[in-house]
Design a protein with these regions (language model features):
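Short solvent-exposed coil/turn linkers within tandem alpha-helical repeat scaffolds
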Residues: 8, 21-34, 67-86, 97, ...
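Residue at a conserved register position within TPR or TPR-like alpha-solenoid repeats
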Residues: 5, 43, 50, 91, ...
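Mid-chain, structured segments of secreted extracytoplasmic proteins
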Residues: 33-72
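"A position-specific structural signal for the A-helix of alpha-solenoid helical repeats
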Residues: 1, 38, 42-45, 86, ...
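Single-residue signature of alpha-solenoid repeat helices
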Residues: 14, 56-59, 63, 112, ...
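N-terminal, post-signal-peptide region of Sec/Tat-exported proteins
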Residues: 10-48
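Short N-terminal segments immediately surrounding and downstream of signal-peptide cleavage
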Residues: 1-8
Length: 237
């Protein structure tokens, strides 16, 4: 029910439902344990229909509070990995808002540099999280026999593989954003762009059969080459 509300864009109704379930004496304890996680997930999903910067920042603040609470109180919960991924996505959104402000006319140079510094910090943390999650999921995949016939294990393996694919794509996407916080010609920018191009190339090679992932990796690769100034290579994609 909750997922359907989110999928249909009824974010306010989903938040009310979560509040009611949190207060309900008959709601399962297992669900109450993840209310803060689900609230953060709903708030972040709602950003897709919000345009005002002040409201966006308010929603991000609320989502971060909920995530902090879940992560602090449920460090061994099975959803801990997903929660940290959500936190990484939250950091990326904050960095993107900073970048939008940097691009606004009339913003003082000192403020621009401060915003860019904040963005770098947020994106570096997001990349660190994605890197840790990637290794964690990889180990979980390796612990399951790829030829298992156990239905539950097969389901888990499939879910892990999908998450692993997504995180592999998240990493170069975040690296590309991080590169954009440095001026053209800066050594840090060139190094990050090279890393992003290499990672996107690896994702394209590994997931040729997955059209959505392959397409996004191709777009990222073309953008990476373009930002490096390799227009001919960018046009190949």
């Amino acid at each position: 029910f909750l997922n359907e509300l989110r999928n249909q864009g009824y974010y306010d109704e989903a938040l009310v439902y979560l509040k009611d379930m949190e207060a309900s004496p008959i709601a399962p304890v297992t669900f109450k344990d993840i209310v803060t996680y689900e609230r953060a997930k709903t708030l972040l999903a709602s950003l897709a229909v919000v345009r005002e910067r002040v409201k966006l920042e308010s929603i991000l603040d609320s989502a971060e509070q909920s995530l902090d609470l879940f992560i602090t109180e449920h460090r061994t919960h099975p959803l801990m990995g997903e929660a940290t991924e959500l936190f990484a996505n939250l950091l990326i959104k904050r960095a993107e808002l900073n970048q939008e402000q940097v691009d606004d006319e009339g913003v003082a140079e000192g403020i621009k540099q401060s915003l860019l510094a904040d963005s770098r910090k947020q994106l570096k943390k997001a990349n660190e999280i994605f890197g840790n999650v990637r290794e964690d999921i990889k180990q979980k995949i390796l612990r399951i026999d790829s030829k298992t016939t156990d239905p539950q294990l097969k389901t888990m393996l499939g879910e892990y593989r999908v998450r692993y694919m997504q995180v592999r794509l998240n990493l170069p996407q975040t690296t590309l954003l991080l590169a954009g916080t440095y001026p053209e010609g800066a050594p840090e920018r060139e190094k990050l762009l090279t890393e992003a191009v290499d990672e996107f190339t690896g994702v394209r090679k590994a997931y040729q059969a997955f059209q959505g992932t392959f397409f996004l990796a191709t777009l990222g690769l073309a953008e990476g080459y373009a930002k490096k100034g390799n227009i001919d290579d960018a046009l190949l994609y």
